[in-house]
């Protein structure tokens, strides 16, 4: 009996000494200057402490409700994604992403499965905070648009660490399919559509399991959480150029939809990121600041005679303007030197499948690389 007691005691101690496990957080965001009630799921001893990347995001545990927090977001918190980490004396759970938005939060209200019985979103822009709560769940949201307006609807889920592959479908009031998107900047969908007539429209969403299995049915569960920003106003897709150099003032063009003031001045940038002000629902825009020189591509540079001359180290901002476009850059190198060339595009949310090739001054190909580390 004494031996059995000792064995059980040791087992119990080892279980309670484990670091907390937090499988999901819902909702995964809130509007700045607001409060929200959030819940976590997993295995942990209550209450857990919370570290936030932003000082203005506070998680206050509800002592009488295990797993629930009152989240307070200060007005001065810059909108965007932030890391939060749940921890106790035994360790920490992996960090999770929490989004702070400018637009009004709209919590999902079930039932909203049917296209003809959707949840009504009173005004745009809005950020839907929802979840596909069970297998087969479809969420439907209705809103109004006017002729000529461009709708932008973007989901954040997979990019926030949620294991699902979602889709979006836009219908008119009669149920006719108008637009569809499955994957955009990642497995998360982004739907763009220009309205052709005044009316009410319904955005429907569902998800598949990821990684995929042999089941083709829509997936769902407590951890299948998402946020969707819906707007008929400004939205930034990217900038040109894609970065700035430290201490170098630049004019940056915002590229996207429904934009009015498309050019922003960046003066003497420093640090790792420069925050660009914009009225866009997904603004402000965080622009990388480089600690090296940047060259912006100058066309034409399709052949060796017109190649842009660069000096190392350098980052080049460029674009493939049309099918068949080839960009060339000339540089000097000495025998025995080693140089590394990296292209970032797919990782930054673009669909380009780029290729790098190295030629000598006579045009002879010395090396070529298409895909590196299983990425495009």
List where the protein language model places each region.
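Sec-dependent N-terminal signal peptides
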Residues: 3-13
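Intrinsically disordered, low-complexity boundary segments flanking structured domains
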Residues: 8-9, 85, 113-119, 215, ...
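Acidic, Ser/Thr/Pro-rich low-complexity intrinsically disordered segments
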Residues: 18-66, 75, 79, 88-89, ...
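Hydrophobic or amphipathic alpha-helical targeting/insertion segments
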Residues: 81, 85, 95-98
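Predominantly extracellular/luminal regions of secreted and cell-surface proteins
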Residues: 95-124, 281-313
């Amino acid at each position: 009996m004494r031996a059995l007691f000792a064995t059980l005691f040791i087992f119990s101690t080892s279980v309670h000494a484990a670091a907390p496990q937090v499988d999901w957080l819902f909702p995964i965001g809130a509007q700045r200057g607001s409060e929200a009630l959030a819940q976590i799921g997993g295995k942990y001893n209550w209450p857990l402490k919370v570290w936030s990347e932003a000082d203005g995001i506070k998680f206050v545990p509800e002592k009488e409700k295990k797993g629930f927090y009152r989240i307070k977001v200060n007005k001065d918190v810059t909108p965007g994604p932030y890391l939060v980490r749940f921890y106790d004396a035994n360790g920490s759970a992996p960090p999770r992403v929490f989004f702070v938005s400018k637009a009004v939060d709209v919590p999902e209200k079930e039932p909203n499965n049917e296209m003809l019985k959707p949840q009504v979103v009173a005004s745009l822009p809005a950020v839907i905070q929802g979840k596909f709560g069970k297998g087969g769940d479809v969420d439907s949201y209705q809103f109004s648009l006017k002729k000529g307006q461009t709708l932008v609807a973007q989901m954040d889920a997979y990019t926030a660490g949620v294991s699902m592959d979602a889709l979006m479908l836009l219908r008119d009031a009669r149920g006719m399919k108008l637009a569809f998107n499955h994957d955009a900047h990642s497995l998360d969908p982004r739907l763009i559509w220009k309205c052709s007539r005044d009316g009410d429209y319904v955005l429907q969403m569902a998800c598949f399991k990821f990684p995929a299995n042999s089941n083709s049915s829509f997936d769902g569960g407590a951890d299948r959480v998402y946020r969707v920003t819906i707007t008929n106003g400004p939205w930034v897709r990217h900038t040109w150029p894609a970065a700035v150099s430290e201490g170098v003032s630049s004019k940056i063009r915002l590229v996207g939809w429904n934009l009015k003031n498309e050019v922003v001045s960046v003066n003497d940038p420093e640090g790792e990121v420069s925050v660009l002000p914009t009225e866009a629902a997904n603004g402000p825009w965080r622009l990388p600041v480089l600690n090296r020189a940047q060259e912006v591509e100058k066309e034409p540079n399709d052949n060796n005679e017109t190649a842009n001359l660069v000096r190392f180290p350098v980052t080049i901002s460029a674009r493939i303007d049309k099918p068949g476009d080839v960009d060339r850059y000339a540089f000097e190198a000495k025998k025995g030197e080693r140089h590394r060339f990296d292209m970032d595009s797919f990782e930054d949310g673009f669909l380009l499948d780029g290729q790098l090739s190295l030629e000598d001054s006579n045009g002879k190909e010395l090396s070529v690389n298409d895909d590196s580390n299983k990425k495009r």
